Amino acid sequence: MNLAGKTFAVWGLTFKPKTNDMRMSPAITIINFLLEFGAKVKAFDPKGFEQAKNIWGDKITYAKNSYDALEGADCLLLLTEWNEFRRPDFDKVKELMKSPIIFDGRNQYDGDRLIQRGFEYSCVGKRFK
């Protein structure tokens, strides 16, 4: 799999919502992996930017909001279940992304509905056709 040059939108950097704490956050491992293989990362988190900048500096892009992170993205990674990520406008999500691919790391979305709407959808512990 060649990730070089691919852009990943990341929603959520902290290990849980309503905190700025990134200790043990899965985002650290995932983003480091993506960067190691030449991917670009554009992330949004309501409270995690200060700690994220200490970890990655300018190696990733910090989006102004969740939709800004999606612009031109090849894939959306939902890594923290912040309230503002619960009910996005999926028409807008699809319109902004280069490829409508979602990995839901929190099993927050209805995968069958997203697949019916034309998304490629993956989550933890479930398979979809």
Where in this protein do the model-derived segments appear?
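Structural/interface elements that position substrates and couple domains in central-metabolism enzymes
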Residues: 1-129
